[in-house]
Amino acid sequence: MGKSIGIDLGTTNSCVAVLEGGDPVVIPNAEGERTTPSVVAFDRKSGERLVGQLARRQAVTNPERTVYSIKRFMGRRYNDVKQEAERVGYQVVPGPHGDVRVRLGDKDYSPPEISAMILQKLKRDAEDYLGEEVTDAVITVPAYFEDAQRQATKDAGRIAGLNVKRIINEPTAAALAYGLDKENDQTILVFDLGGGTFDVSILELGDGVFEVKATSGNNHLGGDDFDAKVVEWIVEEFKKAEGIDLSRDKMAMQRLVEAAEKAKKELSSTTSTNINLPFITADANGPKHLDLTLTRAQFNKLTADLVEATAGPVRQAMQDAGLKPGDVDQVILVGGSTRIPAVQEKVKELTGKEPHKGINPDEVVAIGAAIQAGVLAGEVKDVLLLDVTPLSLGIETKGGVFTKLIERNTTIPTRKSEIFTTAEDNQQSVEIKVYQGEREIAAHNKLIGNFQLVGIPPAPRGVPQIEVTFDIDANGILNVGAKDLGTGKEQKITITASSGLSDQEIEQMVRDAEAHAEEDRRKREEAEIRNNADNLVYSVERSLKEVDGKVDSSTREEIEKAIKEAKEALAGDDIEEIKRKQEALMSASHKLSQVLYQQAQEQQQSGSSGGSSDEDVVEDAEIVDEEDEEKRDDNR
């Protein structure tokens, strides 16, 4: 059995951690960084897949084939994300089931496929760091993620070749990381503002039990929205100054997105920042340059509505938990966007507490996931995690009413059954429509699945007894069953999004991902072979110059021929040919090594036979301490 890791699959950045000797450790990626950009790109010319920092670096020149913030589209229907789709540089299109697809060149990818590419890199980097295979993972999701979004995340893990042992909520993971070594009972509020989502969770910690009392949030609020406000401001300012609308230029917009994010980060530690983008566009008069100054006060004004939008979920979570601000012992900030000073001030205003800043908001969620992975693997003892379902779940009953079976903030796993009956005489089937939400009318909530129970014997309405059972597992994923108690006939479904991927699609994606992983390994091996051959050519050429005139002409010709053939092979694409020519050059260079060795021996012998002159021999020496030296200096 391989190693188990904890993964924070973020909107902007992702992070992976592992337990080593009982302590959680953040795993650096291949580039040496502790977080990896959640960005995937395909090179326009070669089609090569790039993930992480490499993908982010080329985003400006390749905006249509660079995918970022894919988490915003996970488990969502196309009609629900049209506004978000307009804000990204890549093409978002409807899929075959009304779901979301990303069109890159001539191929459409599902959001779980793109996320799987990020997970594959995290898995590979973890394996390189640990020196062993990674098979299992605990992956985090926003607490307010719906059932379909959780299922999509699990699908992404499966496509990446990971056995997803558990899906846990990000605020809960943060609390786990914070509270593992705390002995006293505490009530904590986790304020999690990431790149694309916002969550608030209230937990009680005591005796190794982490119990979530309430959770609330907004899946459409995050750092991306703050960046978008700055981008809108830049576009307007440039339009006023130059009369040019940059929003129509995809390459320029990608530069603006990066500049906006940079400005946002800088304004967390300084009161003003300069946004300088030379050659942003051009008109008939020549190139145009963008040079603007954004102050923190202006930024706060631009984003005031976003900061205010965090207040509602905080108050809702407190109300659901039956708490007043004074009942909260500690406030933990999670997510890079909590570094924004106005956000921190808002948290202080809402809770009356100075937020705890002793943990890295970019890493704490992955650390918590690694601890939970350790709990599931038996490496961490005496820790119990009790999470909750974020939204109420129920079915549509007569008159379009939403009848709740499981209330929001119910501890999971949980199971609930209720008896229903038919609405019409001689009704022989019932359609069970499953909804998620808080509205009284079913149609105002989100339909997450439906199925038919057939074969009910004809009877007057109200006579048949149909037992409907809702079962939520520890991942927050729902199973629904309906049973006719009269006949024993039963129908069950696991709720996946109506826009979800089928098992066949996932299996195909797993095979594609494995093929890509093999392709990546092969490319790495090919690069190593090329590098080794190139280094050999360089060192043999240099050595040949060093022994100029000391190698007979036939040996020189043989080596020069081998060098020439190796260079020709390196110019081509045949890796086997490169290997053959490298071996031939290695063999030819052995004679050169003999000459160099012989030359070194001769130099050594001539050096030792020369001996030493009397002037070089030290017969006696006087040792003088510092005080005597000072006296001598004074006497001079």
Swiss-Prot record:
A Pfam family hit: HSP70
Residues annotated with Phosphothreonine modification: 197
Coiled coil: none
UniProt KW keywords: ATP-binding, Chaperone, Nucleotide-binding, Phosphoprotein, Stress response
Transmembrane segments: none
Positions with biased composition (Acidic residues): 613-636
Compositionally biased residues, Low complexity: 596-607
Domain of life according to the entry: Bacteria
Induction note: By stress conditions e.g. heat shock.
UniProt GO MF annotations: ATP binding; ATP-dependent protein folding chaperone; unfolded protein binding
Region (Disordered): 596-636
Similarity section: Belongs to the heat shock protein 70 family.
Role: Acts as a chaperone.
The protein's name in its UniProt record: Chaperone protein DnaK
Organism the protein comes from: Rubrobacter xylanophilus (strain DSM 9941 / JCM 11954 / NBRC 16129 / PRD-1)
Origin organism lineage: Bacteria, Bacillati, Actinomycetota, Rubrobacteria, Rubrobacterales
